[in-house]
Amino acid sequence: MTQIAYFDCPTGIAGNMCLGALVDAGVPLSYLEQQLQRLSLSEPYQLVATPVLRQGMAATYVEVQIEAAPHAHRHLSHIVALIEAAGLPDRVRDWSIAVFQQLAIAEAAVHGVTPEQVHFHEVGATDAIVDIVGTCLGLDYLGIEAVYCSALPTGGGTVKAAHGQLSVPVPAVLRLWQLRQVPVYSNGIERELVTPTGAAIAVTLAKSFGPPPSLQLQKTGWGAGSHDLPIPNLLKLWIGTASDLVMTPQSPEGSLETVQVIETQIDDCSPQVLAYVSEQLLAQGALEVFSQAITMKKGRLGTLLTIICQPDQQAACETILFRETTTIGLRFRREQRRVLPRRRDRVQTPWGEVRVKVAGDPQSPLTVQPEYEDCRAIAQAQQIALHHIQTVAQQQWQQENA
């Protein structure tokens, strides 16, 4: 089962909050310290974890205490070289570099330079490097395979930075949100709630933003922010395994499950390509794939392709769509569907065995459907009408289960 981490961020996200939540969830501080020493950072520092209360809620506050006040300003190439030379686990190395690369892209767009020319200030400091690499170490230690994140609060007010007094959210954070079209909202708190480091971690590592995915919750971690706020300043980390179904209590009408719906409109793919794509999506694990004829702009005839899949299959389905079709954009949303309990039975007909799909309450099933492929094979072999085979199989099941 896929191991999932979900960052629940009602008061935002920062690198040290991620570290605090991971330590609170069971990542040993000693492990982080040992691994981070491999970075050979020139500035002496201490990694300190402290149990704290935020509005009466217990959490772990992690702080990178720098022994020397000035901090180094580094370019992306310097940081990448540090990480690559550290001998970290492969996933940690790749994740950490990806976070800094994403941050460099955002900073470059803000300042009108290339990512290679970006001169990191706060995020090139020792504490930011420790926060980012430490977070990746913690996720790797817990065996996390997929990261998700809630919508993020915008915050407000101003903050002092290397470029002077900046309004919140700061430009780099806004650009990071824009790159991933992160859902944001105001919770009314006038303070910096999402730092560039926290935004870069979320934007780079999270597969999607919004409600939690379907998972069986195993543990939680609570990471404290630096300040007391009107609501508990906590990042809540949920750890669990991907669950195929998130169900309400059983009802005669079946159970609810959360699914992901992906849609795209295409007007320049052949029917053969669309059929092939549908096969690929179903083979990947999509629950349903269907198409509808539509009229697009300028009166063009097109196809609306819709995919329904489990939330943790979204990324894989998106990869297939972008690779195999001409689409340049996708829409997606979470929905719920109600599913009847289902099982497969077998019945013996005069011509051989037929599988039967039964849906509904075991004592009073609502639908009984003979398997088409079995009936088709018999009909072709025996030269008997298909509908007759289906009727006989259904009647046989009714007799055996009367």
Swiss-Prot record:
Q: Could you tell me which InterPro entries the record lists for this protein? A: Ni_insertion
Q: Name one GO molecular function term.
A: lyase activity
Which domain of life does this protein belong to?
Bacteria
| Database matches in Pfam families | Ni_insertion
Gene3D superfamilies per the UniProt record, alphabetical: mk0293 like domain (3.10.20.300), Transcriptional regulatory protein pf0864 domain like (3.30.70.1380)
What UniProt keywords are attached to this protein's entry? Answer: Nickel
Family matches, as PANTHER family? NICKEL INSERTION PROTEIN-RELATED, PYRIDINIUM-3,5-BISTHIOCARBOXYLIC ACID MONONUCLEOTIDE NICKEL INSERTION PROTEIN
Q: Which NCBIfam families does the entry mention?
A: nickel pincer cofactor biosynthesis protein LarC
Record family assignment: Belongs to the LarC family.
HAMAP family, alphabetically?
Answer: LarC
Protein name, please? Putative nickel insertion protein
